[in-house]
Swiss-Prot record:
Pfam families membership: Ribosomal_S14
Subunit structure: Part of the 30S ribosomal subunit. Contacts proteins S3 and S10.
Protein name (Swiss-Prot/TrEMBL): Small ribosomal subunit protein uS14
Organism: Afipia carboxidovorans (strain ATCC 49405 / DSM 1227 / KCTC 32145 / OM5) (Oligotropha carboxidovorans)
Listed PANTHER family: 30S RIBOSOMAL PROTEIN S14, SMALL RIBOSOMAL SUBUNIT PROTEIN US14M
Function, as annotated: Binds 16S rRNA, required for the assembly of 30S particles and may also be responsible for determining the conformation of the 16S rRNA at the A site.
Gene for this chain: rpsN
Residue ranges, compositional bias (Basic and acidic residues): 1-11
Amino acid sequence: MAKKSSVEKNNRRQRMVKNAAAKRARLKAIIADKTKPMEERFAATMKLAEMPRNSSATRIKNRCEISGRPHSVYRKTKMSRIAIRDFGSRGLIPGLVKSSW
């Protein structure tokens, strides 16, 4: 089980990204628009830089929904390899069979 503080920190980041997504998209559109004057684009760049780092989507870590584990998380199931193996051993994932050779 992951530390609760790490899981909560990631949840806080997700909320920040959701709240700031529109503003970030607006600023990025201004920065990418080559028809705008350079001063306006630079001002938008500075405003984007002043925003909290945790409001960027790249700061979100994929974590296991079951255990909170940050490594080896499958995107499709949002579960770590350990949780998948555990659920598969108990027969809770249809079609998953533990292999042996």
